[in-house]
Amino acid sequence: MIIDAHVHLWKAQTGRREVDGMDRPVRSLTDGLSDFGGEIRQMMPPYMLTGENSPEMLIANMNYAGVNGAVIMGETMDGRQDEYFLAAKRKYPDRLKICAFFDDHEPYTLEGFDGIKICACKLKDPDLLKLFPVFKAARDAGKFVAIELLDGAAQTEELREIAKELPDLMIAIGHFGMVTRPDWQEQIRLARLPNVYVESGGITWLFNEEFYPYPSAVRAIREAAELCGMHKLMWGSDYPRTMVEITYKMSFDFIIKSSELTDEEKRLFLFENARCFYGFDNLPKLPVIPNML
């Protein structure tokens, strides 16, 4: 079985992007395109025609690739999609875990969600300690926190302090600590704490110049495992943005085919760690359907 720890959905993008110190709107167009703060970008594959990034399309991709479960999270550029996530969870309760979205001190709710996503790298005020009440509320409600940090060690000591103060709060650091940036290992070292894990959403984006089968990404996973243990690392795809370059299956196939990881390490990374962290307990077995080739 496989669990994807980092997936995005949206009805229509209503978010923002900072350009020259000013917030510019991000809006869905057609044919997988988006207006990315004044620039037209291929945000998703062109066959996603309407601008909607739907749970039905995600589940179809998961079924085809053999991915049993996924964790849905928001992003500043996508805007708040809470109601859309809740509807997706109602439709696919055994396949999806969903995150509420914390957006720079705007009102938020945890009700109905499994966790909360904090884009700490995009906060106007990067001081994480000022968000301690948000972390504590998640702990008190039995929710996890998914967080993306500024590059390197810019916010690691603050997160370390919070994680130690709230040892019962489960925290997942995204984007594999921004693995291609200087001092990325400082974020990985946080996973030495018992309640902190790391997920690899976006790792194929970060190593896109090298491209499939991403040998440097595999070496980075190996290095991270030496820093915190393979039992603290989880796979994530960053669907659908990474799918403009590769197929969904390719986003984990390079792990399965790697000779640098053992079968047990692959099982932990692709499934078992995320099953334990997110609490997936009723995932369906998926049939293997051959391609028409």
Feature-to-residue mapping (PLM):
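A metal-dependent hydrolase metal-coordination microenvironment
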Residues: 46-106
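Catalytic pocket-lining loop regions of alpha/beta-barrel enzymes
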Residues: 123-234, 276, 282-293
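Conserved, mostly hydrophobic/aromatic
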Residues: 6, 62, 85, 138, ...
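Active-site beta-loop-alpha junctions enriched in small/polar residues
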Residues: 8-10, 75-76, 101-105, 119-121, ...
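Hydrophobic faces of well-ordered beta-strands that scaffold small-molecule active sites
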Residues: 3-7, 70-72, 98-100, 114-118, ...
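Mid-to-C-terminal alpha-helical segments outside catalytic/metal-binding sites
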Residues: 1-5, 12-60, 64, 69, ...
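Glycine-rich phosphate-binding "P-loop"
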Residues: 39-48, 72-73, 115-125
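Generic structural signal for well-ordered alpha-helices
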Residues: 58-59, 82-89, 106-110, 135, ...
